[in-house]
Amino acid sequence: MKELEYPFDSGYLLKKKRSIKRQLLSDGSVRIKKKIAVLGGSTTNDIINMLELFLLNYGIEPIFYESEYNRYWQDAVFGNEEIDSFSPDLIFVHTSNRNILKYPAITDSKEQTDALFAEQMKYFETMWEKIAERYHCPVIQNNFEQPYFRLMGNRDAFDCRGRVNFINRLNTAFADYAASHESFYINDINYVSACYGLDKWSESSYWHLYKYAMCVPAIPDFAFNLAAIIKSVFGKNKKALVLDLDNTLWGGVVGDDGVDGIEIGQETHMGQVYAEFQKYLGLVKDTGVMLTVCSKNDEENALAGLNHPEGSLKPDDFIMIKANWDNKDRNIEAIATGLNIGQDALVFLDDNPAERAIVSAQLPTVAVPEMERPEDYIRVVDRSRFFEITAFSSDDLKRNEMYKENAVRAAQQAQFTDYGEYLHSLEMVAVIDDFLPVYLPRITQLTNKSNQFNLTTKRFTTAEMEQVFADDSYIRLYGRLADKFGDNGIVSVVIGKVNSDTLDIDLWLMSCRVLKRDMEYAMLDNLCDRAKQRGLKTVKGYYYPTAKNKMVKELYGDFGFTKVSEDADGNTVWELSLSGYEPKNKYITVERNK
């Protein structure tokens, strides 16, 4: 089909993929059928849909197995009955730089970065060896695209602590593995991702006609990058960031929306954007750049926003906080004086174009980049190369003596043959507690989107959830799970109604992101403990089957409940006596919200 030949129109294919598939399947072609298992470290549905079109066009009719989100390593190393019965003809491991478990820290030694590299390679080699041992089929593995920011600028490419350097080492090691193993192939997304932009950069006519190594329109970008190195060599880097708060570090206005109304964290897509920006700023801080705040806010509200549980930047991360109703240019002058640096060493970040214009007019030596879209904040700051690093010493670390950003990941897993040992190695910590107002939007969202691990599939509106929150006849639990690789956010919700000496579980759900981690046992232990504290004797659970929740059909039975009834539609009722209940959680340390 012409539409699937290079050069193709990506937008057209994405828009018309269903009709194109129908045309291909009805064209009378004879195709070989092949079973392809896709083990994904990110969402793979649209990849599979598009891959199917190209394969059909090549005369291959694919049958796909798609792993659960980010379960690629566990499925490969510990096995999966579904994949075993699927018996794939080929396995594709779709990972990206988002799946690198830990990058070198700016404080790491060469020995530490080498050890981290060895651990990362062991992680993947363990997976590849298990796949080869179990499935005996070809394997296609992505290498890694370049990172979306360079913390040290061009030094990232040759400093062992740089992300660019670390990814390049991994890509070379992946290539060496492929060269020495039959039926193992690299999907070179490092090249493909670069090619998506490199095509314009490397326009061959500029070389053949003028011997330019790049197209003329790219020369300003080249010169800007070169100038960043030169200005760093001669001591002209910026030294401090001056940060607005509302709609800069989080979405919304904390004074109007309240702490529980601002967007930060995993609950919304914009909350994730702001959370990622805060984490990036924390990394910048670790290089010695000073962080300050200049915000039109009551100080109480500003501090409350900075103390939001989903934010990674806290008040202690900032050397100075100017949260008042004075003109921002005056506050920035005070910050420069307080830090004992020139105004030309400051970078002011603010989403408000009026505030940016005033500061630019009143303080012309302060750098004021255009901050239009939150999704672009990291790109704007990083590619402006305000803090290009050409040398790095311990003195740079001392410049900013506040707490460094907490490490989001620790040493990665080595090979495990016992799943229990693997769970222990995760060092999981759960916060399980009664609902908090700040989490009600996320809890409500979970009730309306969780389908697989959801025993009753009961939905709640915001108003209904607020009623549950205010009613003491309910036992309510939210659970958030973190491990040494990061925080999963709120992943489980249980709501039980107290009726006499019995607790009726109206809702039990859990995010599929944490399946097979024993979080359900931690929730059950906590639920039973609270029920006992209220003098209850029995817990009743209900399972209402849907097209998507069959995976939890026997959950209460696995918990030790006794099935007491089942109707013609498959709805079941289960009971558990609290007398003599023994805790079941073995692997998770449980805390209450602090």
Regions found by a protein language model. Give the residues of each.
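Extracellular glycan-modifying ectodomains
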Residues: 1-242, 249-250, 255-261, 354, ...
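Basic, amphipathic juxtamembrane/active-site segments
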Residues: 254-279, 364-372
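Substrate-recognition element of Asp-dependent hydrolases with the DxDx(T/V) motif
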Residues: 272, 276-307, 359, 442, ...
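Substrate-recognition/cap helix-loop segment adjacent to the acidic, metal-dependent catalytic center
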Residues: 297-323
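Conserved Lys-Pro-Asp/Glu-containing loop-to-beta segment of HAD-superfamily phosphomonoesterases
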Residues: 332-353, 359
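Terminal substrate-recognition subdomain of acyl/acetyltransferases
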Residues: 338, 360, 364-426, 529-594
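A conserved beta-strand-loop-helix scaffold within acyl/acetyltransferase catalytic domains
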Residues: 431-511
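Acyl-donor binding region in acyl/amide transferases
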Residues: 484, 490-567
